[in-house]
């Protein structure tokens, strides 16, 4: 099959659909989202059967536990996908909403309103739930979407996208608005990245390798959803029990996600008291700790951390630990090794808390809370399209507004520019 020809045909169909979607009434979009949710729940067995085949093949390939967790679907996760679509339907429609208006001295009335981006390409890896989340958000924001998931989840993604596209079409969404690329050949990604004039933006979601490849090679504008080398710094004044609770949640509640903690920093003044408690709590959750020399002097059972560990997103039950001199050293470490995702400080010192939030360069900066909250649902955006770690167009969890652009509407009464 001619991949380039097929991809261009998909892009042309999406472009046609996007023009109709841009002016579709909110009620039609919401009805389609609810129909898509119903279809997922009613045909859950079809999705689970496809997912079981994907999982069987992934296990045979020896893929690691964290990858299998991202790939795995069950009835609960399918219900979450359906609920995400219903929550998206319940969110306010950003399209045509005004966020600025003025009347100029010459009488011109100027308004700025939200409009869809157009056609969005999503390139992602193991998570089949992204198929539903992305399709729902793009549709609600008036965008057509072309989805290209990872080869390991191909059966799951085909099942989900087929159900969603059929349900949406029956509910009044233009044909071609939701499309899935069923080629597993990497050539499809390369072709997709060069569909300038058809795709308005590409959003990659996945590991560092995928994101680097897309950002360095795409001819289409890219919104970078970064990897998550997230830190928690335990300050000298921290409530240590709170710090342990937050650290365990940030690392062990779901270690494969991008908002999980990868490195814990602790102030030298409390390290001797705090680290044995941390070691016990993490060991109980089967987390392997890799420490700096100062940390291992306190807890010799820690593995030795290398320079590479400080910049590694493990996606697994592994945690790097470093003892730092003070807040200044903690901030310097974070700004050197982080990926601009989510960072946290545990402290009772408000001056230190405010300084940490000012000086740490990240999309989300927490005081006395787990980094695991960096998520569209938790931020009240509904499902998210991804978590942007770049600073242009969008940053942090990207909900509906991040999938729109702006248009200026100007009303005059015959004015001409002198």
Language model segments and positions:
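C-terminal core of ALDH-fold dehydrogenases
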Residues: 31, 327, 332-417
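Flexible, glycine/charged-enriched surface loops at secondary-structure junctions
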Residues: 26-27, 95, 171-177, 255-260, ...
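Short, well-ordered beta-strand elements within core beta-sheets of diverse protein domains
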Residues: 17-23, 264-266, 316-325, 340-345
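Rossmann-like NAD(P) dinucleotide-binding subdomain of oxidoreductase/dehydrogenase enzymes
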Residues: 90, 99-237
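Short beta-strand-to-turn element immediately C-terminal to the catalytic PLP-Schiff-base lysine
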Residues: 233-237, 265-268, 324, 345-348, ...
């Amino acid at each position: 099959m001619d991949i380039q020809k097929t991809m261009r045909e998909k892009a042309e169909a999406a472009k046609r659909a996007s023009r109709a979607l841009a002016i579709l009434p909110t009620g039609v979009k919401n009805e389609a989202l609810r129909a898509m949710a119903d279809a997922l729940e009613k045909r859950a067995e079809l999705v689970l059967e496809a997912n079981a085949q994907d999982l069987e093949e992934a296990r045979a390939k020896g893929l690691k536990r964290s990858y299998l967790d991202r790939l795995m679907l069950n009835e609960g996760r399918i219900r979450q996908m359906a609920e995400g679509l219903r929550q998206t339907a319940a969110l306010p429609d950003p399209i045509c909403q005004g966020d600025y208006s003025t009347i100029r001295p010459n009488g011109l009335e100027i308004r700025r309103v939200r409009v869809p981006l157009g056609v969005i390409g999503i390139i992602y890896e193991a998570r089949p739930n992204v198929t539903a989340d992305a399709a729902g958000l793009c549709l609600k924001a008036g965008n057509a979407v072309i989805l290209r998931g990872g080869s390991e989840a191909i059966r799951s993604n085909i099942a989900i996208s087929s159900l969603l596209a059929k349900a949406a079409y029956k509910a009044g969404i233009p044909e071609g608005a939701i499309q899935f690329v069923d080629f597993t050949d990497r050539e499809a990604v390369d072709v997709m990245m060069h569909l300038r004039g058809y795709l308005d933006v590409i959003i990659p979601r996945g590991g560092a390798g995928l994101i680097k490849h897309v950002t360095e090679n795409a001819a289409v504008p890219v919104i970078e959803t970064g990897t998550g080398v997230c830190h928690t710094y335990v300050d000298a004044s921290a409530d240590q029990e709170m710090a342990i609770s937050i650290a365990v949640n940030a690392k062990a509640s779901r270690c494969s996600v991008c908002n999980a903690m990868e490195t814990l920093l602790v102030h030298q003044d409390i390290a001797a008291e705090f680290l044995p408690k941390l070691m016990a709590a993490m060991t109980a959750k089967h987390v392997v700790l890799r420490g700096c020399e100062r940390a291992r002097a306190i807890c010799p059972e820690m593995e030795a951390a290398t320079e590479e560990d400080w910049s590694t997103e493990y996606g697994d039950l592994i945690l790097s630990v470093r003892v730092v001199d003070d807040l200044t050293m903690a901030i310097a470490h974070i700004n050197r090794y982080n990926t601009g995702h989510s960072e946290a400080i545990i402290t009772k010192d408000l001056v230190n808390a405010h300084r940490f939030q000012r000086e740490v360069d990240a999309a989300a900066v927490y005081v006395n809370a787990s980094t695991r909250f960096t998520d569209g649902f938790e931020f009240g955006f509904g499902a998210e399209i991804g978590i942007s770690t770049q600073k242009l167009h969008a940053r942090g969890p990207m909900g509906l507004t991040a999938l729109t652009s702006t248009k200026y509407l100007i009303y005059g009464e015959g004015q001409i520019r002198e």
